Amino acid sequence: MKGSIWTIGDVQGCCAPLAELLAHPEIAGDTDSRFWFAGDLVNRGPQSLAVLRRIMAMGERCTAVLGNHDLHLLAAYAGVRKPSKSDTLDEVLQAPDAVDLIDWLRFRPLAHYEAGHLMVHAGVLAKWDVAKTLALAGEVEQALRGPNWRKALQKMYGNEPATWKDDHTGGKRMRVIINALTRIRLCTPSGHMEFATKVAPGAWPAGLVPWFDVPNRATRDVTVVFGHWSTLGLLMRPDVICLDTGCVWGGALSALRLHDRKLVQVKCKRFQDPNGD
């Protein structure tokens, strides 16, 4: 496929900054470009419905992976979870085209690989190489796209198991895959996921490291592109790129052109306090 790839961080229902970003001369002038979204298209911001409609209308120019807030929307629509006070999903749930939007969303991938870049919402476990990540993501994708997708969503909540075993089955297997791809931030050096600690980057207790610094990570030979971690903010290394720059918290919405790492950002209005996921 021709054209540049612009990868965009967590939008979280902030449609005005998204429109401004896509209209930026550097991006709008790149007429053959394609767009990768690193998940969390919806929630916490005021315009989740408009965001979904806009990105859905981009058609084949857009690749969006599922984030934890996107999965939460699916669960709320399915009746598996009730929206919380901080959620801003009612407009989507009550929309006349809700069925179409939900069907589009549940057919999004959990991982995407192209041109040496692996995009996920949150991260990958150290034992997983690209092929295994895509295969395991595919297991969950198949469940979400099938006729029993509502039942599949019932299995995804919980922090355990926190480590991967090839012989995990059923709900345990699905939870580990979803938690790694959409929720992970910190791990022990042996790769045990840790969800209780929520502190500023660099202030985490001894014995915890960011998932991407777990020793011998099997994806270190490619570049993993992710969002999810607004307090970490913009991070660009040869092996990892974090693009969650806290749009909904009053930070910025960021887009990065992958082939030359050209960065474009637009400032965002603060809609909520940065005290959630």
From Swiss-Prot:
Record keyword Kinase present: no
Database matches in InterPro entries: ApaH (IPR004617), Calcineurin-like_PHP_ApaH (IPR004843), Metallo-depent_PP-like (IPR029052)
Pfam family, one: Metallophos
UniProt xrefs under Gene3D superfamilies: 3.60.21.10
Keyword Cell inner membrane: no
PANTHER family with a match to the protein in the record: CYTOCHROME C5, PTHR40942
Its biological purpose: Hydrolyzes diadenosine 5',5'''-P1,P4-tetraphosphate to yield ADP.
Family: Belongs to the Ap4A hydrolase family.
Official protein name in the record: Bis(5'-nucleosyl)-tetraphosphatase, symmetrical
Organism, as annotated: Bordetella parapertussis (strain 12822 / ATCC BAA-587 / NCTC 13253)
Gene name per UniProt: apaH
